[in-house]
Amino acid sequence: DNSGTMTMTVDGKPVERIYYGANGNASGLAVLVELARMVKTNSIMFRRSVLFVAFGASSETFAGSWYFLNRSFPDTGNIDAMINLDMLGLGNNGFYAYTASNTDLNAVIRTQAGELQPILPEISAMEIYPSDHRAFYDKEIPAVHFTTGRYSEHNTERDTQSILDYENMERELEYIYNFTLALADADGGFAFRSADVSQKNRDSEDVTAYN
């Protein structure tokens, strides 16, 4: 999903241009890969297993994450929570955490805020944009979506590495690592509240149901 094409009209003629997806979503993938390395290096500190998955087909209404949960992975009932890393490359756009107002996940975020952190996310009450967390909500799995939000270069040829803020991404990575560790070491499970999800997503884009 990190590169594609778009058709623009130049001098009255359709011209196909490449867009590179540096922020959408090579930035999230880069954070995921480095986070996986950090978790592996410090695996003895994690009480729960942490599974890293990169989903494709987001433009097909998140078919990749749907397929993982419904066709590929047999142990979805053992998933306690999901962390969605999507578009994390901007430095002047804010850093957000969307949980569909999940009390348990918000409690972890607030606990982390009381500790020394390189950056803190703003908890968003409303879904910032649809992403792969949607498929996990459909399975009643709590999920948090970390992102720097929407941006004008998305799905255009201007989505190049020049718009990325690498220092900010490093701060986000360190925070997300600390959050992942706190989530993995938390006592008990995390409750899913379907009423919260339906309320927060009711005015957002529809998601196709696959069979």
Where are these regions (language model features)?
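Acidic/histidine-enriched alpha-helical segments
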Residues: 45-55, 82-85, 186-205
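Solvent-exposed, polar/charged alpha-helical surfaces in well-ordered, non-transmembrane soluble domains
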Residues: 29-33, 37, 66, 107, ...
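His/Asp/Glu-rich mid-to-C-terminal helical/loop segments that flank catalytic regions of hydrolases
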Residues: 30, 152-202
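Sec-exported extracytoplasmic/periplasmic mature domains
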Residues: 34-44, 70-74, 110-118, 177-188
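Metal-dependent peptidase/peptidase-like ectodomains
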Residues: 55-150, 165
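Catalytic-core environment of secreted peptidases
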Residues: 1-53, 73
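Soluble non-cytosolic domains of exported or imported proteins
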Residues: 19-30, 44, 59-63, 99-104, ...
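C-terminal recognition in membrane/secretory proteostasis and scaffolding
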Residues: 156, 204-211
